[in-house]
A protein has these predicted regions:
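A short, hydrophobic beta-strand/beta-hairpin element that forms part of a small beta-sheet core
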Residues: 11-14, 29, 42, 50-78
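A short beta-strand-turn-helix
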Residues: 1-9
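Conserved helix-turn-beta segment immediately C-terminal to the redox Cys motif
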Residues: 8-9, 24-45, 51
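Non-globular targeting/processing and membrane-anchoring segments
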Residues: 2, 88-117
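Conserved redox-active cysteine motifs that mediate thiol-disulfide chemistry
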Residues: 14-28
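Non-catalytic, surface beta->alpha helical segment in thiol-disulfide oxidoreductase systems
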Residues: 60-102
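Short alpha-helical
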Residues: 20, 49, 81
Length: 117
């Protein structure tokens, strides 16, 4: 995950099986990641199965979504937000990072090629 975060943002969904809001959020993030076509990557971390990772991110409540950018965590949001708000948060992050992370523009170019559709 850290190595990949040097190229494009890695959005980390910190969740648990028993968490109702987590179950609402996960499909939204998966859909947005697919639409992002490589401009960012989704990683899912079950906090019960990975307590050390949860502790490293400072998880106090779930769902919690952070981005790892250049190996550094960046808090995005907590809770199951409405899809338009999540989309806006991720789009804003991509816009801010586009010039610093060449993997974003490379993914956008690839997605724009006719045979990649």
């Amino acid at each position: 995950m850290l190595e990949r975060s040097l190229e494009v943002p890695v959005v980390v969904d910190l969740w648990a099986e028993w968490c109702g809001p987590c179950k609402q959020l996960s499909p939204v993030l998966e859909r947005l990641a697919a639409e992002g076509r490589g401009t960012w990557i989704l990683a899912k971390v079950d906090v019960d199965a990975n307590p050390r990772i949860a502790q490293a991110f400072g998880v106090q409540s779930i769902p919690m979504v952070v981005a790892v950018v250049g190996g550094q965590p960046l808090q995005l949001f907590n809770g199951a937000l409405p899809e338009p708000q999540i989309r806006q948060t991720i789009d804003s992050m991509i816009d801010q990072l586009r010039d610093r992370m060449p993997g974003i523009t490379a993914a956008e170019r690839t997605a724009a090629e006719p045979d990649s559709r």
